[in-house]
């Protein structure tokens, strides 16, 4: 089942038995997530922050096993990770992380992209809104963006989405850099932060 879908894309999904169908579903979900999160912040930046919205450059998927993967400030991005590069204002993710998370369902694909997009928002919003736990704030803002996109009609949020994301975070906790509790917080902390954003919106995530 496609857990989240942009309304103009419609169904399609990740329930196909063939690997090719699953790959198509993953790429569709990635594209959907990018569109929905960008659309939310484009429409609502001025509701929360002064100035103009500046979306990150989307480098998209890379293969973390490749020596030719992207670099940020001279350092190669990590395998099984997703990143926002502050100095170059881009986001990118290891396709292998997305494939790993997809075994649990497609929910975490949306969280990964909304989380990294939130880091780009943190980099451009006034510093007074930052909190010390920037990773948990990004989880909160990511949840707010996805829920906001659902309220706007850009995204369809189905029953059980939050539970699916929670199960994926617990299942992958400590297995990848993106789910490393030392850097990002425990699975429980991340789930609580994400759900705060979903329930109460962007303002609940800000200092």
Name each model-derived stretch:
Residues 1-71, 203-207:
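A metal-dependent hydrolase signature that marks the N-terminal structural subdomain at the beginning
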Residues 27, 31-38, 42, 94, ...:
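Extracytoplasmic/secreted envelope proteins and their assembly/folding machinery
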Residues 86-95, 100, 140:
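Polar-ligand-bearing catalytic/cofactor-coordination segments
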Residues 61-64, 94-97, 113-117, 122-126:
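Active-site-proximal beta-strand/loop segments in catalytic clefts of secreted hydrolases
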Residues 61-92:
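Catalytic zinc-binding patch centered on the HExxH motif and its immediate surroundings
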Residues 117-133, 144-151:
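Catalytic Zn2+-binding segment of zinc metalloproteases
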Residues 95-111, 126-132:
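Short pre-active-site segment immediately N-terminal to the catalytic Zn-binding motif
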Residues 150-207:
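Long, well-structured alpha-helical subdomains associated
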